[in-house]
Amino acid sequence: MSMTPREIVHELNRHIIGQDDAKRAVAIALRNRWRRMQLHEELRVEVTPKNILMIGPTGVGKTEIARRLAKLANAPFIKVEATKFTEVGYVGRDVESIIRDLADAAIKLLREQEIIKVRHRAEDAAEDRILDALLPPARVGFNEDPAQSNDSNTRQLFRKRLREGQLDDKEIEIEINEAVGVDISAPPGMEEMTNQLQSLFANMGKGKTKSRKLKVKDALKLVREEEAGRLVNDEELKAKALEAVEQHGIVFIDEIDKVAKRGNSGGVDVSREGVQRDLLPLIEGCTVNTKLGMVKTDHILFIASGAFHLSKPSDLVPELQGRLPIRVELKALSPQDFERILSEPHASLTEQYRELLKTEGLKIEFKPEGIKRLAEIAWQVNEKTENIGARRLHTLLERLLEEVSFSAGDLAISPDAAPIEIDAEYVNSHLGDLAENEDLSRYIL
């Protein structure tokens, strides 16, 4: 990650409106990963990541920041919900499976990168195998000179036709590696055992091939994947993945507030306090056994988030609070924020609906006053009922464009015709009554 914090925030601004404090904290944390890697090894070991706790109501951008961060980081990243895990010893997934999933994500990420590097070599090798199937080598008698030049010219001619797609529908018989896959279902918490069994069965059938009759375009795709797999060194890949997980891994734990013990409840809850105590060594730094080997979690960055509607950050066990030193509070959205969300981000909601309906030949245009009125209604409904943040806009837009979406095929008009205008009057006529009537908005919006 060589992007500066300012560049990271600028990139996040393309997709997320407001929440500057959260963006800055995440950008600094990401940049610190890069800074740490520039240090001498002795000091590098001592510098641990400063984990983040994001606090804010639902629908204000906590999860979206995580999603966008994953794409920016180009590092092993996994997003999990804290509610999916139970205390060790009980039925369900234990928190160590987070690191195992992170290891899987690292292998997938690095394999894709390696395959891109060897893509051209794999394509050449795949073409040769397809040409061998199309043009079997001529049999040559003893002491006879093979007509190499003729063969070569014919092969080049076929290679040209293959690349131009002229042979795509021709059927050939070709040897393909036999896929050995065994689906094993197991109870939650036993994923490691199923992975080991699947690896065992896969290794038993490794190297077996079978002859298949396929169209050239399908065979080319399969053979290309096969050749790319051969060119990637699995042992080297595992070593790189292990380093990537330990040095650059990022874990985003959502819904952390749901495992916080509420102030007025007594006793110990298996799904709450036990999960927090299991998370402690993971965040502090421990060693977890994965398919890559033993993974140390000391330098993995953990970002936790929660709405904390029914509990407070202080309801988390004190040790966990201490392991999440950076606190960032995300603010509730205002009508102006809703207005910006509808129009400013890259691939905004209004742009998505406009492009979707354009596929039917129907043009719609969102007027500024229509967007403003829609934002006001979203804010009003959130205030009167449950505040679900920007997710309310999805509900309102679906309701607003329901009739247009349903009749789009019938309404499609000539390309020169004027578009359907979504202005304040249109919004009021479709949503005004529902927004004003609290009982209706509670059930419909």
Curated annotation (Swiss-Prot):
HAMAP family: HslU. GO terms for biological process: protein unfolding; proteolysis involved in protein catabolic process. ATPase subunit of a proteasome-like degradation complex; this subunit has chaperone activity. The binding of ATP and its subsequent hydrolysis by HslU are essential for unfolding of protein substrates subsequently hydrolyzed by HslV. HslU recognizes the N-terminal part of its protein substrates and unfolds these before they are guided to HslV for hydrolysis. InterPro entries: AAA+_ATPase, ATP-dep_Clp_protease_ClpX, ATPase_AAA_core, Clp_ATPase_C, HslU, P-loop_NTPase. GO terms for molecular function: ATP binding; ATP hydrolysis activity; peptidase activity; proteasome-activating activity. ATP binds at I17, G59, V60, G61, K62, T63, E64, D254, E319, R391. The keyword Ribonucleoprotein does not apply. A double ring-shaped homohexamer of HslV is capped on each side by a ring-shaped HslU homohexamer. The assembly of the HslU/HslV complex is dependent on binding of ATP. It holds the Pfam family AAA. It is found in: Cytoplasm. NCBIfam families: hslU, PRK05201.1. Keywords: ATP-binding, Chaperone, Cytoplasm, Nucleotide-binding, Stress response. It comes from Pseudomonas savastanoi pv. phaseolicola (strain 1448A / Race 6) (Pseudomonas syringae pv. phaseolicola (strain 1448A / Race 6)). Belongs to the ClpX chaperone family. HslU subfamily. Its main location: cytoplasm. Signal peptide: none annotated. SMART domains: AAA (SM00382), ClpB_D2-small (SM01086). One of its GO terms (cellular component) is HslUV protease complex. This is ATP-dependent protease ATPase subunit HslU.
